[in-house]
Every structure is written in C-alpha cells, then in structure tokens.
C-alpha cells in the first residue's frame, strides 16, 4: 500500500493493530524514552501519545514514536510487502546509480518502463498546502509549545530527533534531505548537528564560501509521509532527488509547497515545518547527548538555526524518537535498509553473496561480507571496495570477509570462520588515519581513526604454504538412512 501522508500510514498501522494509542498522560521528559525503549525491545507497536504532559502542563500536539520500530514497518513505509522485497528497491537503485547500456532491443524495451517511471516522478509544487494551514511568526514562534523529547537524564536539553532537514547548495537545483538532530537552545533557536560529510553540511559550506555575509535558508520537516522520511536515509544516487525517489516508492509524484520565507520546498502534507536561517558565524556548543552508541557523546560546535516561522496542519502530530544502545529505532532502520544495500554492492562486486550490518554494531560500525572467493587477496579487495564505494560505509570500523558457506547473519558461524580460517597477523588488515564518526570516542582523534579488516576466508596457494583443512561432512547415504530411521528412534 502507498501513503500520501503520515496520517494515512498511521491509519493503516492502526487497522493492522500495529499502532497503539496511549491515552494516559505521559511526559516527553524521559518517560516517553523509557516506554518506547521497552516496547521496541519487545517488538511492539508504534505509539501515539495522545496526552503529552510535563510538570502539569498539557501539550496540544500528540507525539508519534517507535514508528519504524520493526523491520516490517520500515518495509511497509517503503511500499514493500516484506523486508526481503526491499532488495528489489536496492536493485532499482543499483541500476539508477550506474545504468548499463542496453544489450539489445529487448533489453532496452524491458528497461524503458523503469526509466519512464523515474522521469515521471519529478515532484510537483502545489499552491495551497495543508502544512501551511496554521502559521506562527514573530513572537508566536515558540518551540516550548512542542512536546520535544528530553531523552536521557544526562542530555543537555530537549532534542528534535526526526527533523527532516531541507537544504540546497548555491549551484544546485536539487534539494538535499537529511536527518540531523537539533538541540533546542531557545524559543526560536536550535543547534544543527550535521557531520562534515553529510549533504546538509556540504550545501552550507559551499553556500558560505560564496556568500560569507548572507543568512542561509533551512527548513525542517517534522512528520511527513513514510516514503519521504525513508528516502532521506536511503543511498539515493546523486542523479536522483530524495523527493523523486519518494515518488518512485509511493507510485505518485511528491507534492511540495514552497516555504513562505525562502525558495526551499517541503512536503505539502507535512505535519509541522520549521523555517529559518543560519546566520554567519552563529555557532554554539552542542551536547552532550545519549547517542546510538549507548554512551553520551562529547560536546562540539555546530551552526545555529534561527527559526523565523513555524507552519503546520490543523491538529498536527509531532514525530519523535530516541537513540541509545542498540537496539534502538536507527538500528532497526539499519536492519531493514541492509537489504537495500545488498544489491547495490553486488552490482559493483558480483562476487558478494551477502552483506550484513549487525545491529549490535551501532548500525554501521561493523560489516560481515560473504564472497565467492576467486583468487589470493580477494577478501582484501572486497574490504577496500566496501569502505570506499558508498558514503554510508566510510565510518565502518570493522569488516569481516567470509566464504559463501558461512551465514553472515549467524554469529556462531562467523566466529567459527574467524577462529579456524584466520591467522591474526597474516589475515588482519589495519589502516590508520581514516574518516571516523566524531561520536566514536574510542578513536585517538575526533573524526580520524583506524579501520580493521578480517580475512576469515579459506586460504589459497600464495596465501599459505600449508595444506589447508578439509571440512568434516557426513556421508549423504548415511544421512538419508538416519532420516528414514528417525521416527523410529523416539528422539
């Protein structure tokens, strides 16, 4: 099923009993995090807190949480029937990322519908948009009226967590969508914590270099249709906008509205939109905050967004989440999006059989890759390829490469391969001074650290001078005989 806005998705989840309305008053200060964490760990439903309260004050906005708390709900949001169907989306992205010339007339004809569909999914602008039914400007702008979560006891302040941030570089037609957390530091001011390599930060840096004294327009969308939200966290090719990709997922063009104070465009049916500007040299110290690592992160300086106006629908819904020690919602998103990554990597490296990001590894810090090994050094080539091919894996610290007889998603098999097919000195690749997530306090320098590759494949001549072990396998005839006897054995 496809969803035109967040409310249609909520209605479908409720119909399938995958969403629970919480009528009991609950505070966004810590309580929602604890409830959401327990429900997510139990594989429970999305939550709609209908009576957010704090210190006796009742907010006018219900809070939607744990929306993508299971891989199945992520698949639903992307218009797929199940998680494995996400590989079809990955195959589409792999083709769009590196289209191949048709092998003949039939191949060209077969590819034509996809190309026509992509071209027809350019977003369209509408003049009247529900997201601008209500407008707060000037003194009316007050983030304190929104039930913004304060997630952990040691957090510095309330934190906007599901803000879909819209930016545009000075020489680009394409808008960038990214999800960056935002610390509230005033009634109309938030700190925009975007990492240096992310699209929003790159757009801002490029703009500031060309316009050192000009305020930079930014819009933040809080709550919109699931295809647009998930498009912002999917490895969309640079030739395709996230809005266009969302239309492809949804099967209909994304309807956009121009912001009231800039030429940026936002989803017309968004719940809440923050419009503002980043002024030159306006920076602030962000954090500390509990993060997806399970620890509080260090403080660092980031640009401040001054909010000029807040627009919204009638009876808007505030969409929120928390991050913490896995599993959390980003980890669950990683489990689902893992299936999108597999075909993209396989197109570049056909020898890859499977690729797995264990959620315990904070979604991206460790990858297990199985390959059909063909030559000495093959595992190392795959490691280097995974680190460099997609931006999403530039912060992956550990890559383990195994043979195709090992299930990458079974730790028992992976550990068996590591302990029987690896020599710690010969088969460990260490690289220093590589880009690392600045939240990784284990790195010696903020933003710069090491990577480790583990070659847990069977070794070939040229990689070892010893006779390699032969796996123990039971005789097929004996197995068939025992199968036939099994019911008589009483076991």
From Swiss-Prot:
Decide whether keyword Signal is in the record. no
Enzyme class per UniProt: lyase
The UniProt keyword set, sorted, is: Cell membrane, Decarboxylase, Flavoprotein, FMN, Lyase, Manganese, Membrane, Metal-binding, Ubiquinone biosynthesis
Per its record, what are the GO molecular function terms?
3-octaprenyl-4-hydroxybenzoate carboxy-lyase activity; metal ion binding
Q: Where is the signal peptide, in residue numbers?
A: none
Instruction: Indicate the residues that form the catalytic site.
Output: 291
Task: Give one GO biological process term.
Answer: ubiquinone biosynthetic process
Binding of prenylated FMN: at which residues? 179-181, 193-195, 198-199
Bilayer topology reads:
Peripheral membrane protein
The Gene Ontology CC terms held by the record are:
cytosol; plasma membrane
Q: Mind telling me which InterPro entries this protein's record contains? A: UbiD, UbiD-like_C, UbiD-like_N, UbiD_bacteria, UbiD_Rift_dom
What the entry lists under NCBIfam families is as follows: PRK10922.1 (NF008175), UbiD family decarboxylase (TIGR00148)
Q: What protein is this chain from? A: 3-octaprenyl-4-hydroxybenzoate carboxy-lyase
Which species is listed as the source? Answer: Chromobacterium violaceum (strain ATCC 12472 / DSM 30191 / JCM 1249 / CCUG 213 / NBRC 12614 / NCIMB 9131 / NCTC 9757 / MK)
Gene symbol? Answer: ubiD
């Amino acid at each position: 099923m496809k969803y035109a806005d967040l409310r249609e998705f909520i209605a479908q989840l409720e119909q399938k009993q995958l969403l629970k309305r919480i009528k009991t008053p609950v505070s966004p200060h810590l309580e929602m995090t604890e409830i959401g964490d327990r429900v997510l760990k139990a594989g429970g439903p999305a939550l709609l807190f209908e009576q957010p309260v704090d210190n006796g004050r009742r907010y006018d906005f219900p809070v939607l949480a744990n929306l993508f708390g299971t891989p199945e709900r992520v698949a639903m949001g992307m218009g797929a029937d199940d998680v494995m169907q996400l590989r079809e989306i990955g195959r589409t992205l792999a083709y769009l990322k590196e289209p191949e010339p048709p092998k003949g007339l039939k191949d060209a004809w077969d590819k034509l519908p996809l190309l026509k569909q992509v071209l027809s999914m350019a977003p369209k602008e509408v003049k009247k948009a529900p997201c601008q039914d209500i407008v707060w400007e000037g003194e009316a702008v007050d983030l304190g009226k929104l039930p913004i979560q304060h997630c952990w006891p040691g957090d510095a302040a309330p934190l906007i967590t599901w803000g879909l941030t819209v930016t545009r570089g000075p020489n680009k037609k394409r808008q960038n969508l990214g999800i960056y957390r935002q610390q509230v530091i005033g009634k109309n001011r938030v700190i925009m914590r975007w990492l240096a390599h992310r699209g929003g930060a790159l757009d801002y840096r490029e703009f500031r270099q060309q316009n050192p004294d000009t305020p930079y327009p930014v819009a933040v969308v809080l709550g919109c249709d699931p295809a647009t939200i998930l498009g912002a966290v999917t490895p969309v090719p640079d030739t395709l906008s996230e809005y266009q990709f969302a239309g492809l997922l949804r099967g209909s063009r994304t309807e956009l509205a121009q912001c009231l104070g800039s030429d940026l465009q936002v989803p017309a049916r968004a719940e809440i939109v923050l419009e503002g500007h980043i002024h030159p040299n306006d920076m602030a110290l962000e954090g500390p905050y509990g993060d997806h690592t399970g620890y509080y992160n260090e403080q660092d300086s980031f640009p401040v967004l001054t909010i000029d106006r807040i627009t919204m629908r009638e009876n808007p819904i505030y969409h929120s989440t928390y991050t913490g020690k896995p599993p959390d919602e980003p980890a669950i998103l990683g489990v689902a999006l893992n299936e999108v990554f597999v075909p993209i990597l396989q197109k570049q490296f056909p020898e890859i059989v499977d690729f797995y990001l264990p959620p315990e590894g904070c979604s991206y810090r460790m990858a297990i890759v199985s390959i059909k090994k063909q030559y000495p050094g093959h595992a190392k080539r795959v490691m280097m390829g995974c680190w460099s091919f997609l931006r999403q894996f530039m912060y992956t610290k550990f890559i383990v490469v195994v043979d195709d007889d090992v299930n990458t998603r079974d730790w028992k098999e992976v550990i068996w391969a590591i302990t029987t097919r690896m020599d710690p000195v010969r088969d460990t690749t260490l690289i220093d001074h590589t880009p690392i997530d600045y939240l990784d306090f284990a790195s010696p320098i903020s933003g710069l650290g090491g990577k480790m590759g583990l070659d847990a494949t069977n070794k070939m001549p040229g990689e070892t001078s010893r006779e390699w072990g032969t796996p123990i396998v039971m005789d097929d005839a004996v197995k068939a005989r025992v199968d036939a006897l099994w019911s008589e054995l009483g076991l």
